């Protein structure tokens, strides 16, 4: 036994003697240590005092202590100062009688008051719940209704509702405690009295029937209507049958001095329900649950009779006496109320527990001790933040910081964090306990590989498993015996950060078929000085992006790489001299294309300068320069003069850069620029070889045709619609 206890004992904390913090703490003077400890203590006290929950509890204690009968001057003075500082000033606010809305009055409000025993607390909570049910069922009529309960002590004391309060205002702390003579022993938190003449009737019944523990005296309208009938209550329904025999009494005002309680007691006899003619009814029960059960059935039976009486009393069907007696015996037979042989329910207890669940769901805080904890409302269940079960709580951070309750943003962020933690806990608790290994083949790749996944095993029931006893909080994560382990790990992390050895990890070769360093080697200039443009087909470089199957674990079996041809930057090898030469060329081309633009009715550029040149224009000029150079080389090789080549080049540049509409002689419709450009290059090369400029002739002939046709304004508008916005001529 001793060895088992030593095994379950927590491992002691080992202090590292070489720890710098520990050495500083030993060298620190005692005065400074005391100051630091006092600062920490005051900080903790300040945090508690600023807590809203602590202020709420303190206000409740002050309210209850102020209402006690203690008359010590010092005690009252201290309470007065505390109440001035904490308790908000203002009158007591009550909700509507039947519409509570969001401001509900708690039933079990006995907090921080130890003058009541545990048994009396339960009795007060239960009686206060009965008052709240009577209000919700609309049994009460104003303040002239009385419910009393005999306590379990030997002093023959009673609990009764304070006179002047409506039933929805009564709580466990406001109930008045009196003796058999009506003397107030505890006036509750509101210091209210009781209806003395009404309690005299209750006291007389308690003396005549020692087994009676609870009495209800109600003036419900529907019951008063049945009590005024000569026929009385008829056994028309099951609710009327379970009441058994009922008594009747010709009611007189209780305030009269000559009233005889013996007559009321005689009419009541051994019955549980007594109808007071033209006034209401009186219910006596062995327990609060029994009395509530009888009162509820009485009201329902009276409602049934009043509705059925519209057809006439002669037309009503009365059950046989045997059926009535059988229904009464079944309601009193406690053996028939057993559920699976585990719980013995007395009369009214099962219905009472269901009503308590209704009240707790409505956040009335009944304080009821449930006999069926599994049916207890979740809103009323107390949740503990301390849980030694490592399986119930998912792995997460265990540090808790202090929340500034005055900052709304921090409070809202804290609530969101708690919500996320609860969602993670639900996901963790609902995760399967049994898994099976499943392998998938990757598709979309040349060499597919196997992807292993662990999924829920549907063949194993969820309730199966081996229970494990949690004997220690470090059962699944044992504490280390080396006190220097944390410091060594911390120093190693700091050293790695200082050296800069951390990296993003290995570079993925799946995302890119070739790296940019390899591309730079592949696009080196040839022997003739050209870079990549003359041999694009031979140097097709594929780059690509991968699907989310490479990143997302759920799609590992469907990993694909999407390729595209690498397009280098056309200006990556250009120097400053080439760019300046290009700018001069653009200016020269604009000056040459000005007459053509004027004849065509539009212009492409407006004073193109080095700062205003667009990238698209530069790409076009770069392509034209390459085409012109190739045409010039072909012309020189064929023996053509440079003037003819220049004329051909000017025709190409004029027809392409000015973006003029080129018409074929047979087809007057305009042709697209993108499809026309390669054909013009071929025509230029062909004309250079033959010694003629067919492209120039075509351009001139088409231009002459356009001048001779002299299109109308509508045709000009149609032509302008086919060009880009920056190509149109600006209106001055």
Curated annotation (Swiss-Prot):
Gene3D superfamilies: Class II aldolase/adducin N-terminal domain (3.40.225.10). Keywords: Actin-binding, Cell membrane, Cytoplasm, Cytoskeleton, Membrane. It holds the Pfam family Aldolase_II. Its main location: cytoplasm. One of its GO terms (molecular function) is actin filament binding. InterPro entries: Aldolase-II_Adducin_sf, Aldolase_II/adducin_N, Aldolase_II/adducin_N_sf. It is a peripheral membrane protein. Residues 685-705 have a biased composition (Polar residues). The keyword Cytoplasm applies. Residues 1-22, 684-732 are annotated as: Disordered. It is found in: Cytoplasm, Cytoskeleton; Cell membrane. GO terms for cellular component: cytoplasm; cytoskeleton; plasma membrane; postsynaptic density. One of its GO terms (biological process) is receptor localization to synapse. Residues 716-732 have a biased composition (Basic residues). SMART domains: Aldolase_II. Belongs to the aldolase class II family. Adducin subfamily. Membrane-cytoskeleton-associated protein that promotes the assembly of the spectrin-actin network. Plays a role in time-dependent memmory loss and the retention of conditioned behavior over time. This is Adducin-related protein 1. The gene is add-1.
């Amino acid at each position: 036994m001793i060895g088992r206890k030593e095994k379950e004992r927590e491992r002691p904390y080992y202090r590292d003697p070489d720890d710098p913090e520990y050495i500083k703490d030993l060298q620190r003077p005692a005065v400074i240590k005391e100051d630091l400890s006092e600062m920490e203590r005051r900080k903790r006290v300040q945090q508690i005092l600023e807590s809203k929950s602590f202020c709420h509890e303190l206000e409740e204690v002050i309210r209850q202590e102020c209402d006690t009968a203690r008359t010590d001057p010092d005690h009252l003075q201290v309470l007065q100062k505390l109440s001035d500082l904490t308790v908000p000033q203002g009158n007591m606010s009550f909700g509507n009688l039947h519409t509570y809305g969001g401001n509900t009055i708690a039933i079990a409000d006995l907090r921080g008051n130890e003058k009541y025993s545990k048994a009396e607390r339960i009795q007060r909570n239960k009686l206060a719940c009965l008052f709240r049910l009577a209000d919700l069922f609309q049994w009460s009529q104003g303040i002239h209704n009385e419910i009393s309960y005999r306590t379990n002590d030997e002093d023959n004391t009673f609990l009764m509702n304070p006179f002047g309060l409506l039933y929805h205002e009564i709580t466990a702390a406001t109930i008045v405690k009196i003796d058999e003579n009506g003397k107030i022993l505890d006036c509750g938190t509101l210091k209210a009295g009781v209806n003395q003449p009404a309690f005299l009737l209750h006291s007389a019944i308690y003396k005549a029937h020692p087994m009676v523990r609870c009495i209800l005296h109600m003036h419900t309208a529907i019951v008063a209507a049945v009590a005024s009938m000569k026929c009385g209550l008829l056994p028309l329904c099951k609710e009327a049958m379970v009441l058994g025999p009922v008594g009747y009494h010709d009611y007189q005002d209780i305030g009269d001095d000559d009233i005889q309680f013996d007559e009321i007691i005689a009419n009541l006899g051994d019955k549980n329900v007594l109808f007071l003619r033209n006034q209401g009814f009186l219910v006596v029960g062995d327990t609060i649950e029994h009395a509530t059960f009888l009162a509820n059935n009485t009201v329902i039976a009276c409602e049934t009779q009043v509705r059925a009486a519209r057809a006439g009393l002669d037309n009503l069907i009365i059950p046989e006496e045997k059926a009535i007696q059988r229904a009464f015996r079944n309601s009193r037979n406690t053996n028939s109320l057993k559920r699976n042989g585990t719980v013995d329910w007395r009369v009214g207890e099962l219905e009472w527990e269901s009503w308590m669940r209704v009240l707790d769901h409505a956040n009335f805080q009944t304080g009821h001790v449930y006999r069926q904890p599994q049916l207890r409302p979740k809103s009323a269940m107390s949740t503990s933040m301390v849980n030694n079960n490592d399986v119930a709580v998912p792995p997460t951070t265990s540090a808790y910081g202090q929340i500034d309750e005055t900052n709304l943003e921090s409070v809202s962020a804290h609530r969101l964090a708690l919500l996320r933690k609860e969602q993670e806990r639900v996901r963790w608790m609902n995760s399967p306990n049994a898994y099976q290994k499943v392998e998938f083949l990757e598709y979309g790749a040349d060499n597919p590989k196997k992807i292993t996944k662990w999924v829920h095993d549907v063949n194993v029931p969820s309730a199966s498993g081996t229970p494990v006893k949690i004997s220690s909080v470090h059962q699944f994560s044992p504490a280390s015996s080396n006190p220097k382990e944390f410091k060594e790990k911390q120093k190693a992390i700091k050293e790695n950060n200082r050296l800069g050895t951390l990296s993003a990890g290995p570079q993925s070769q799946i995302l890119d078929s070739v790296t940019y360093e390899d591309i730079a080697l592949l696009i080196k200039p040839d022997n003739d000085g050209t870079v990549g443009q003359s041999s694009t087909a031979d140097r097709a470089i594929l780059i690509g992006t991968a699907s989310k199957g490479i990143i997302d674990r759920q799609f590992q079996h469907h990993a694909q790489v999407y390729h595209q041809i690498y397009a280098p930057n056309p200006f990556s090898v250009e120097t400053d001299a080439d760019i300046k030469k290009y700018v001069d060329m653009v200016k020269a081309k604009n000056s040459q294309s000005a007459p053509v633009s004027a004849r065509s009715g539009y212009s492409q550029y407006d004073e193109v300068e080095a700062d205003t040149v667009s990238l698209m224009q530069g790409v076009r000029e770069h392509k034209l320069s390459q085409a012109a150079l190739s045409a010039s080389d072909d012309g020189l090789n064929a023996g053509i003069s440079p003037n003819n080549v220049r004329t051909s080049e000017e025709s190409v540049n004029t027809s392409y850069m000015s973006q003029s509409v080129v018409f074929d002689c047979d087809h007057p419709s305009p042709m697209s620029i993108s499809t026309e450009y390669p054909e013009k290059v071929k025509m230029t090369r062909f004309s250079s070889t033959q010694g003629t400029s067919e492209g120039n002739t075509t351009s001139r002939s088409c231009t002459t045709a356009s001048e001779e046709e002299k299109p109308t304004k509508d045709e000009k508008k149609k032509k302008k619609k086919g060009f880009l916005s920056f190509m149109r001529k600006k209106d001055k």
